[in-house]
Amino acid sequence: MSFNLQVFLFSSFPLLLVLLLLKSFYPSSKSHKNLPPSPPKLPLIGNLHQMAPGPHRALQSMAQTYGPIMLLHFGTVPVVIFSTVEGAKEIMKTHDVVFSNRPFLDIVGRLTYDAGDIVFASSGEQWRQMKSISVLHLLSKQRVQSYQQVREDETVLMIRTIQQANESVINLSELINTLTNNVISRVALGRTYERNEVKAILDGIVELLASFSVGNYIPWLGWIDKLRGLHRRADELAKDQDDFVEGVLKEHEKKKESSVERKDLVDILLEIQRDNSTGFQLERYMIKAIIMVTCLSFESPPPSIIPMRTART
């Protein structure tokens, strides 16, 4: 059966290509008034070939020709590009509600509990409630100040490491990265974790999120992603990350009866879920999604200005 399916797909590909070419040469008679300027596109891939070698440079170059607002096609997906501060302000501030939604991407959905977090969730009641929880309970000024001791403790440990090195060569960027990761880990998860415990999972997730998914741009060719093994790899990583996050949650649930003066992010989320204090049912998968997005910040490189200023001091 699988053989017959593959034979059908590959044998029908030339016909599909011919149909696409005909469509490009004989466009629809529908009106396309008020569309921004657009560079010529190729059948099937649209303007994707013009994104090399770097999208930011390519977009800057095309903006000089087609203006600050232009229409591109990434595969079959139309994309409007704004290249000015004024345009960005219109989108991000003036008309933010209109542009606030996010497309659902298959690989992202597999890795984030169907976009159950704040970063990748579509605009809607769930996203608004989770944003409210984050602003009022996780990122409030009082909450951030309560973790000052954590930041001071980890900074002292880093300084001691530098002092103990004497005149030996040290990798300052690596030390800053460790400091950042430890602070985030203690604030979010309650304790530090060895990088090896989560590094393979996080590296795999970052790699998949950055990979080119054909289905994102040409939905009817999404089966190519399955043939490439992207779906299988995403499902494997999703299971590994769920095992890790479930372990974190169970560890916190065991200690919930003990008095904890300084609650971490997981403690707060579990408390909100248990007490239903916000009037919004915070599901377990939502908590897991928030934790994983937080863990992904472990992989973010530290700002280069920090080691530079430290070295000068």
Per-segment meaning from a language model:
Residues P103-L111, Q145-I305:
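Cytochrome P450 heme-thiolate monooxygenase catalytic core
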Residues L17-K33, R191, D275-G279, P301-T313:
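Cytochrome P450
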